Regions:
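Short hydrophobic core segments
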Residues: 21, 216-226
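Glycine-rich FAD pyrophosphate-binding loop
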Residues: 35-56
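Helix-loop-beta segment of a Rossmann-like dinucleotide-binding subdomain
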Residues: 142-181, 185, 202-204, 212-216
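Flavin (primarily FAD) binding-site architecture
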Residues: 223-238
Length: 260
């Protein structure tokens, strides 16, 4: 709490090279990268860091295997290389994980075709992970006896990556890195909007806890507010060609007993 109060007191002193609004993964990474390059950076978030979209992930860093079916190969290639970069850059935080999937009899694709797809996926990732495996029913029963293979034609196993701790911790480590490099970060500080004053951005902010307002001066303003990007642009009077279109996904976890 004392660190937060100290950082808030520094926010309206002097001029920052960059003010970043939003402490999710994009804002946190931007703060760490810019601070590492020697820029003076301030980062604020109206809630907890990684307190919204960035803490509602599946904790996976994947290469987009499902997009092979829609033939979006360029995207799969890009995602696989990004996944590899994360594993290589943060080996204690992002680690390889194996996935095993069974294939029901009568499925629209033959098991050999799906297995070939996992090899394409592996090759798009430059063979960075362990090789895929084609599994027959007998092998699945031997290696994973908890899986019900009564109606299975076989299965396959391939690799992706996951966040070893969790998504929020992963994000905060970038916030911490930014502060270690001289950046100023404060949560529960809401941007009320910004205006131009010559070559500077003047952002009016409010301490959500005590209600006090302050002005933050910066040469550059980065709006990394996630789902609140459009709302903040309206507050600031910024017009953009593109706007957010929200979507929601579901990751369903079932009781282990229901698969036996």
């Amino acid at each position: 709490m004392k660190l937060r109060e100290s950082n808030i007191q520094k926010l309206d002193r002097g001029v920052y090279d960059v003010l970043i609004i939003g402490g999710g993964i994009n804002g946190a990474v931007a703060a760490a990268a810019l601070s590492g390059k020697g820029a003076s950076v301030a980062l604020i978030d109206q809630r907890d860091f990684a307190g919204f979209t960035s803490q509602q992930s599946s904790n996976l860093a994947w290469g987009g295997i499902k997009y092979l079916e829609s033939h979006d190969y360029a995207l799969v290639r890009k995602l696989c290389l990004s996944r590899n970069h994360l594993i290589d850059s943060y080996p204690s935080r992002v680690q390889e994980i194996r996935f095993l999937s069974t294939i029901e009899k009568g499925f629209r694709f033959h098991p050999w075709f799906l297995w070939a797809g996992t090899w394409v996926y592996w090759l798009f990732g430059n063979g960075f992970t362990k090789i895929p495996r084609l599994l027959f029913k007998r092998a699945i029963n031997r290696e994973e006896p908890a899986i019900n293979t009564q109606n299975a034609a076989g299965g396959f196993e391939y690799s992706d990556a996951y966040l070893h701790d969790n998504d929020s911790r992963f994000v905060f480590q970038f916030v911490r890195s930014a502060m270690d490099r001289g950046g100023i970060a404060a949560n529960y500080v809401e941007s009320l909007g910004a205006r131009r004053d010559g070559d500077l951005w003047i952002t009016q902010a409010r301490d959500v806890i005590d209600g006090k307002t302050l002005d933050i001066r910066s040469k550059v303003l980065i709006n990394a507010a996630g789902p609140f990007v459009d709302e903040h642009n309206q507050r600031t009077g910024e017009q953009t060609e593109h706007h957010h279109l929200f979507s929601k996904g579901i990751h369903l976890i079932v009781d282990r007993k229901s698969i036996v």
